[in-house]
Curated annotation (Swiss-Prot):
Thylakoid among keywords: no
Example GO molecular function: cullin family protein binding
GO biological process per UniProt: negative regulation of cell growth; negative regulation of G1/S transition of mitotic cell cycle; negative regulation of protein neddylation; positive regulation of apoptotic process; positive regulation of protein neddylation; protein neddylation; regulation of cell cycle process; regulation of protein neddylation
Keywords from the named record: Cell membrane, Cytoplasm, Lipoprotein, Membrane, Myristate, Nucleus
Region (Disordered): 1-87, 284-304
Name this protein carries in UniProt: DCN1-like protein 3
Places the protein is found: Cell membrane; Cytoplasm; Nucleus; Cytoplasm, Perinuclear region
Chain's role: Contributes to the neddylation of all cullins by transferring NEDD8 from N-terminally acetylated NEDD8-conjugating E2s enzyme to different cullin C-terminal domain-RBX complexes and may play a role in the cell cycle progression by regulating the SCF ubiquitin E3 ligase complex, after UV damage. At the cell membrane, can promote and as well inhibit cullins neddylation.
GO CC terms in record: cytoplasm; cytosol; nucleoplasm; nucleus; perinuclear region of cytoplasm; plasma membrane; ubiquitin ligase complex
Covalent lipid sites (N-myristoyl glycine): 2
Coiled coil: none
């Protein structure tokens, strides 16, 4: 899984503010002044007569069809405010600090330095939250777009700004709908998109399940992970359906598994898990019973 299992604007940033409208032109000019301006702008004013093109008269162009050039060079785009320009500049400097020399992205080495400056371990839950907010496509990598869009999403443009967002991100992840979105993102995040993977390797899935449930560890999780760990030969990978349905499983099935039914539409791997866990508990109970039995008055260790 590499050195990291995840991928990350100053709280005072102000993005998207607008400049004021252009002051209207003065109305004190006379007709003569207006006429003079028209003569100076023949392309947008009204011509004095018909225009000859190759000796043929051509109808004069309608004044409304002409447009004056704008000082910005792009009439449809509003100029950025000073605050937004400053924020984008800080983001650019931050991105360049960690980006790869050959690729316009933050890769594993840069990610480690980024996490070190944030005072977080690359394998911890807070880094997964950043990857979620950045909508990172793969582990240990932030593209330029992911980094800029992600920092804007959390309104931070500096290391201190990102660190200041961690408490609110941790709180947000406790909301049921937000956690569901984070949970589903985590599956896609764990896939190797370059190889076109459609299922998670067993070891990656185990690590990501432990990570994503950092703040909310369901009672059945440890039993499930033990099952996956002790049955490596029978479990090659975890499909998206199995991953998504496990969240439902933790919400409706109790830790004793007594309300589980094979007749319901659960993935077949869940049937195998419940059968395996029930058998394990049966053997465990029989073992305890054997230790407690024996000749009356003798402890198990005193029997020969």
């Amino acid at each position: 899984m590499g050195q990291c299992v995840t991928k990350c604007k100053n709280p005072s940033s102000t993005l998207g503010s607008k400049n004021g409208d252009r002051d209207p032109s003065s109305k004190s000019h006379g007709r003569r002044s207006a006429s003079h301006r028209e003569e100076q702008l023949p392309t947008c004013g009204k011509p004095g007569g018909d225009i000859l093109v190759n000796g043929t008269k051509k109808a004069e162009a309608a004044p409304e069809a002409c447009q004056l050039p704008t000082s910005s060079g792009d009439a449809g785009r509003e100029p950025k405010s000073n605050a937004e320009e400053s924020s984008l500049q800080r983001l650019e400097e931050l991105f360049r600090r960690y980006k790869d020399e050959r690729e316009d992205a933050i890769l594993e080495e840069g990610m480690e330095r980024f996490c070190n400056d944030l005072c977080v371990d690359p394998t911890e839950f807070r880094v997964l939250l950043l990857a979620w907010k950045f909508q990172a496509a793969t582990m240990c990598k932030f593209t330029r777009k992911e980094f800029f869009d992600g920092c804007k999403a959390i309104s931070a443009d500096s290391i201190d700004g990102i660190c200041a967002r961690f408490p609110s991100l941790l709180t947000e992840a406790k909301q049921e709908d937000k956690f569901k979105d984070l949970y589903r993102f985590t599956f896609q995040f764990g896939l190797d998109s370059e190889e076109g993977q459609r299922s998670l390797h067993r070891e990656i899935a185990i690590a990501l399940w432990k990570l994503v449930f950092t703040q909310n560890n369901p009672p059945v999780l440890d039993q499930w992970l033990n099952f996956l760990t002790e049955n490596p030969s029978g479990i090659k990978g975890i499909s998206r359906d199995t991953w998504n349905m496990f969240l439902n499983f933790t919400q409706v099935i109790g830790p004793d598994l007594s309300n589980y039914s094979e007749d319901e539409a659960w993935p077949s791997l869940f049937d195998t898990f419940v059968e395996w866990e029930m058998e394990r508990r049966k053997r465990e109970g029989e073992g305890r019973g054997a230790l407690s039995s024996g000749p009356e008055g003798l402890c198990p260790e005193e029997q020969t």
